[in-house]
Structures are given as C-alpha cells and as structure tokens.
C-alpha cells in the first residue's frame, strides 16, 4: 500500500526547497527564455524545476512530469507532476500571487498535493487519505450553495484561443456569480477554493501541472475536483468546487 504520509513529506520538502530558491532570486535581473503571445518562460523556471526534480528523485523512484523539462522517463502507475513556478508573469511583475505546485498522480487521478505560496510562507497540502492543511491548520471548502452568493476564480490559459462565441458564453456565465476573479495562477486559484476563500475554480485548456496538486488538496478539503478531456499535451478542463455547487 502506498505510504501517502511519507510521500507527502517528500513533496513538502521539495516544494520548500524550490520556493526558497525562487525567493533568493526575487528582485534580481531574470533571464527570459521565451516571451511569445500571452506566454513567458524564465531561466528561473527551468532551474527551479531541476532543483525540485533532483529533490524528488533522490527520495523516490517515481517518474516526474514537469512543465519545463517534460518527462524524466516513461510514466508508471504513480508519478510526480511539477509546476516549479505557477504564476511566472506575476512573479516577474512583483505581483505576489505565484507558487510551487507538486502532485502525486495515480494514472490520471491526483492523489496528493503540495502547494507552497512562498510569497507568504504558506504551505498547503493534503492527500486522499487525509484532511487538507494550511501550515498546521486544517482548511475546508466553503458552505455557499448559490452562485449569486459565490466567487468564481477562472483564467484564460496562455496557449488557448477562444472564438467569439466561446467568449460570449464565458461572459454570460460570469453574470451568474456574485464575484469573478482572474489571478494569474491556477494553483493559487485552486487553493482559494480549498481554503473557502472562493467557491469555484474552472478553466478549460489548462495544463495538468498547473492544477493537479490543487485538485488533490480541494478534495482533501471536502470539495469536488473534476478533471476531464485530458489531451496528449496534458491540457485538461478543470472544475473545482464545494459540495453544494457541484450538484
């Protein structure tokens, strides 16, 4: 039987190591590897992912799927998914909404998640056999049951292009909610749902590494995480919410 508590400690250690490295480089002149359309990549993204992968590999034999460097080897039943810096644009512009995100997957299901909000030294974590926590404090999803009382967090993925009709449908959906937020980090959006700060996160065409850890933590917090339409490049459609709005 998989020892999820032990793997959780490994993921927490790697996330903290990655987050501390990012903090050490915050405010420095950063090398931009790619700036195209709505997407941007830093050398720091790649360097941080390498550090996290080394930490995970030194303590486990699972393969690793990373945003920046792809697969370490063929995927097995269990594998790590890593986003070394979710919210790169925010980080580059000194907007303190970014994080390190690490998930353990069983086939296509996130079973463990760690998200380190290094800007505030907040560590979120949980797995399928545990509660969800912010540092040492348990967190749970909210009890709001109506959209017109609730907050939706969403986004427009950098590599997704919406038709006019799709944009129209999105705006129509926004009108059902009390508040709508776009914060530039899918992982942080998921955490807001897990911690009861928002009721729903949804985004189509988002990459798996941005939402996998959040999915596991939302479910550990008593919520519902739906990941559908997984594509060959690991884009997915994600909806995370509380129990009331899932029905």
Q: What are the functions of these language-model segments?
A:
Residues 1-85:
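N-terminal subdomain of lithium-sensitive/metallo-dependent phosphomonoesterases centered on the IMPase/IPPase/PAP
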Residues 22, 45, 56, 88, ...:
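Residue-level signal for inorganic ion chemistry
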Residues 45, 67-68, 83-86, 90, ...:
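Acidic active-site catalytic centers that drive phospho-/nucleotidyl reactions
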Residues 134-138:
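A structural micro-motif at secondary-structure boundaries
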Residues 141-247:
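An extended, acidic
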